[in-house]
Amino acid sequence: MEEVEATLMKYMTFNSSCSYAGIANMLERHGLDTSDRSIAIGMKLPYLFFRCNGIYLSGPMLQEAKWFNLYLNPIGYELSEKMMPADEAAAYLKAQETAMLGIRTGNTGKHAVVYTGTRADRLVFLNNKWESEEAPDEIQLTVDELKQKLDPTVVVATLQQVSPKSVSFTDKLQESIAGLAQSFTSLQQELLCALRQEPEQCILLNENISMDRLQTSAQSYAVL
């Protein structure tokens, strides 16, 4: 699709919020004025904590559609994600009005950018960045240049307008509580190992052990 000029660039206002600023930029192209911070607050980001494949995720590291839709669904939008080989991404993007994906940027890992259209033989992306950052607001890439900046398999997110629907935070908050409990157990285990100063004798704690027992155990080892 041909490039559609955005009326206002939405910048990052907190660390690692490029995908959140990206959602704000996509909504801007639909005529909605919001910000990365408003999105984070609207989806109750400070209270979300998730454990996936043994890794604890929170804050702006929660970047999947299921998290963003906590904010988007009530205002009548939904984010969808499509996985595809890198060499199919350019053609897919050209069929969209706007889309978001992660590209490699030097040694800083992946960075979320928003596709806005084409200019001559280049795909044009909004560079979700800090306003004070010395980097261009736009990134223009040929098809080959884009492919070089993508992982072999890429996830492209698109935004669709839907009927507004309410969302329940109950399940997500319960998941957060469970994740925090698991994190606490892991932390206590590391604490006990450190207090013993004998890693080979590290006690493997049961995930269901009570907080009182953990605290008592830690206090006991503290006097050894």
Residue ranges of model-derived segments:
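Cytosol-facing boundaries of transmembrane alpha helices in integral membrane proteins
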Residues: 31-43
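Noncatalytic regulatory segments and standalone regulatory/sensor domains
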Residues: 118-224
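Conserved active-site-adjacent core of cysteine acyl-enzyme catalytic domains
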Residues: 2-14, 20, 24-29, 44-160
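A generic N-terminal leader/anchor concept
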Residues: 1-34, 194-223
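Alpha-helix capping and helix-coil boundary motifs
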Residues: 35, 84-85, 168-172
